[in-house]
């Protein structure tokens, strides 16, 4: 990952700053860059943090989204904008509604999910009111090497790698293992983002996912089977959420019919890559 980042740094102009919450600075940045495409992924994306500090999540995600749209209008060149929402927008989904289509009701059940619904709707409103060429996506759970251990697959892999290295006892601390999620590799999702912004229809929204659901317990078993040691699994109440959705699985027919995209990297490969990444980090 570090080698790839170094390669990219030689090909991009990197600006560091709190631009999203500073509209004048963001407008200056847009004027200097003159973008054709705007990929807006910056957000407070950790659901539990939205419960402990909901206002920070709402401000960063909603105000940041609005500023991106305002800066795009001010630019005058109408760049294509990708608004990245979340499958969490759908919230509590009834079994009869699975797999989840873009037309499903939105029932957000966390401050984070509410913020993503607001971003989604702002994107549509600025398309409808100002003719900004906005494409919206609702990605389902995506994973890969380098992801923060705040997220479940990276958390499990990091615990295994540290236990293998003798940094702590071989005990795996877990939350809810019954929840089922639609996991895709981030490399597939990023490919989908580019297809969405380049081939998606302005004003439309598209699901991105693997169209398969796996329980968190299945993910854990796959990672444990790749470990070089035996680990004991222990529940940890601190890892449980105030509300959790039992099953999430995407229907991506709309996006596939538009672009031909589908998730290609198997879950097993993604998990092995994540575990190998953390083994490398632990050795440093």
Q: Can you say where each PLM-predicted feature lies in the sequence?
A:
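Generic structural signal for alpha-helix termini and adjacent loop/cap motifs
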Residues: 53, 71, 75, 159-166, ...
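NAD(P)-dependent short-chain dehydrogenase/reductase
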Residues: 93-99, 121-182, 186-197, 211-213, ...
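Mid/C-terminal beta-alpha module of Rossmann-like enzyme folds, strongest
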Residues: 156, 199-240, 252
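N-terminal Rossmann-like NAD(P)+-binding domain of SDR-like oxidoreductases, especially those catalyzing
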Residues: 1-142, 216, 265
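Non-catalytic, hydrophobic alpha-helical segments
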Residues: 189, 193, 208, 219, ...
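Conserved beta-strand segments of alpha/beta enzyme cores
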Residues: 11-13, 133-135, 173, 204, ...
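Amphipathic terminal alpha-helices
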Residues: 267-284
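Residue-level signal for the nucleotide or nucleotide-sugar donor/cofactor binding architecture
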Residues: 21, 52, 60-63, 103, ...
